[in-house]
């Protein structure tokens, strides 16, 4: 089954609104047709208004880097999925290892967020991934599988088919170490197999699975050649317009 690739840049806690606007202006007119690939950037909350406004007449989609699982209320410092939808965001990244690690997010939190995101008409990009210790112990498939099952629990088959899963081995995020092509393929296939077990093969064949972890213009083509890798969630290489655009060269 042919799945449309999705390349998403995750700016993390970088860029002020002026820098975000300049980035979008630099890349927007150079992006390929949405028939070929979906392209998105995940901007910090303080940059979302500017980024969405700058991207609105282009094919560039915009993601939030997180949200809460309630729409309104006494949740100081949190971001409402309802307001993200009203602002014009397309995606919300949830379950990133930095959120799990530094902010103690649980699989249950991530599952609640996924449901809230869908309830507001947005699409979740659900992250999963194992530590170096888990990887070296040979338990990556089991660990990541449990994360995926928990994150998707209670969603409909239709919802799961439409979301994006991002496999990011924690040991490869921002470390300069990247998974081999075989590692990426095997783990993205394992993620898809969990979806097949929980929701059926037809859903698994539709869901898009990204690889993330030190993806750069030099290695993106190798990852995109893997049958079960449908895209990339990219950190460092998404901060400069030139390197971000170069990630799309795999299409040639």
From Swiss-Prot:
Pathways per UniProt: Carbohydrate biosynthesis; gluconeogenesis; Carbohydrate degradation; glycolysis; D-glyceraldehyde 3-phosphate from glycerone phosphate: step 1/1
GO cellular component: cytosol
Protein residues bound to substrate: 10-12, 174, 214, 235-236
An individual GO BP term: glycerol catabolic process
Active site: 96 (electrophile), 168 (proton acceptor)
Keywords, ordered alphabetically: Cytoplasm, Gluconeogenesis, Glycolysis, Isomerase
EC number assigned by the record: 5.3.1.1
PANTHER family noted in UniProt: TRIOSEPHOSPHATE ISOMERASE
Protein function: Involved in the gluconeogenesis. Catalyzes stereospecifically the conversion of dihydroxyacetone phosphate (DHAP) to D-glyceraldehyde-3-phosphate (G3P).
Known partners and oligomeric status: Homodimer.
Name of the protein in its database record: Triosephosphate isomerase
Annotated source species: Streptococcus pyogenes serotype M5 (strain Manfredo)
């Amino acid at each position: 089954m042919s799945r449309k690739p999705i390349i998403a840049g995750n700016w993390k806690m970088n860029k002020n609104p002026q820098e975000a606007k300049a980035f979008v202006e630099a890349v927007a007119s150079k992006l390929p047709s949405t028939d070929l690939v979906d392209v998105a950037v995940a901007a910090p909350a303080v940059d979302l208004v500017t980024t969405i406004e700058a991207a609105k007449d282009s094919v560039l989609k915009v993601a939030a880097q997180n949200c809460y699982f309630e729409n309104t209320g006494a949740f100081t410092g949190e971001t409402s999925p309802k307001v993200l939808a009203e602002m014009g965001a397309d995606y919300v990244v949830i379950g990133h290892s930095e959120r799990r690690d530094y902010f103690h997010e649980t699989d249950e939190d991530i599952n609640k967020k996924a449901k809230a995101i869908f309830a507001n008409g947005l699409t979740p990009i659900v992250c999963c991934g194992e530590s170096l210790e888990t990887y070296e112990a040979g338990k990556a498939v089991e660990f990541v599988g449990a994360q995926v099952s928990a994150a998707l629990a209670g969603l409909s088959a239709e919802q799961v088919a439409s979301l994006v899963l991002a496999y990011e081995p924690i040991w490869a995020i921002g470390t300069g170490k990247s998974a081999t092509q075989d590692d990426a393929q095997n783990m993205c296939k394992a993620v898809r197999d969990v979806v097949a077990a929980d929701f059926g093969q037809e859903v698994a064949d539709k869901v898009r699975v990204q690889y993330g972890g030190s993806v750069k213009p030099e290695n993106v083509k190798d990852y995109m050649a893997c049958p079960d890798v449908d895209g990339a969630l990219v950190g460092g290489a998404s901060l400069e317009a030139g390197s971000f655009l170069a990630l799309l060269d795999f299409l040639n």
